Amino acid sequence: MQIVLASQSPSRLMILRQAGVEPVIHPAHVDEDAIIAQLAGAEPDEIVTRLALAKAQAIAPEHPGDVVIGGDSMLLLDGQLQGKPHTPEATIERWRQQRGRTAHLITGHAICLGERRVVEASRTTIHFADASDTDIEAYARSGEPLQCAGAFTLEALGGWFIDAIEGDPSSVIGLSLPVVRRALYSFGLNASDFWTK
């Protein structure tokens, strides 16, 4: 039995590796925009967990005896969910909106083993620094935040611009180890069952 990560996120992979797990990487390809459109008006936690579940369910049939993890993260600011900015221009615009403010990073998790599944959202409060225009532009040009929910990273260059977080740091990076641990326990498994170190 293995852990299968339904993601190509380097951050999610890093979290698992640092926690002693070498997962199988099997990215799920789902139409996130279509799923979000179907969920118009849904609560933010519902949206991110449904995205995570779609990813896990897309590949779970190919891994019937393994633990499959799907995840998705979005930033909630002023009642609006924000995903990845994709461009330096969008990153700069977002940072000008969020600097000096507080927002919530919501990470949806879907952990499946056969027919059993645990679906849970983890919320972490992010206190953004009042970053200068020069730093915002340099950060956007670095390329680092372009594929990150909320246009930031906690574990790399973006760490300069986060004053504080309240909640689970691993969830901000992309995968809550406490959520995964609770799911494993509910399946009668232990985190240490998957350690390779």
From Swiss-Prot:
<dbReference type="GO" id="GO:0005737">
    <property type="term" value="C:cytoplasm"/>
</dbReference>
<dbReference type="Pfam" id="PF02545">
    <property type="entry name" value="Maf"/>
</dbReference>
<comment type="similarity">
    <text>Belongs to the Maf family.</text>
</comment>
<keyword id="KW-0963">Cytoplasm</keyword>
<feature type="active site" description="Proton acceptor">
    <location>
        <position position="72"/>
    </location>
</feature>
<protein>
    <recommendedName>
        <fullName>Nucleoside triphosphate pyrophosphatase</fullName>
        <ecNumber>3.6.1.9</ecNumber>
    </recommendedName>
</protein>
<dbReference type="GO" id="GO:0047429">
    <property type="term" value="F:nucleoside triphosphate diphosphatase activity"/>
</dbReference>
<keyword id="KW-0546">Nucleotide metabolism</keyword>
<keyword id="KW-0378">Hydrolase</keyword>
<dbReference type="GO" id="GO:0009117">
    <property type="term" value="P:nucleotide metabolic process"/>
</dbReference>
<dbReference type="InterPro" id="IPR029001">
    <property type="entry name" value="ITPase-like_fam"/>
</dbReference>
<dbReference type="InterPro" id="IPR003697">
    <property type="entry name" value="Maf-like"/>
</dbReference>
<comment type="function">
    <text>Nucleoside triphosphate pyrophosphatase. May have a dual role in cell division arrest and in preventing the incorporation of modified nucleotides into cellular nucleic acids.</text>
</comment>
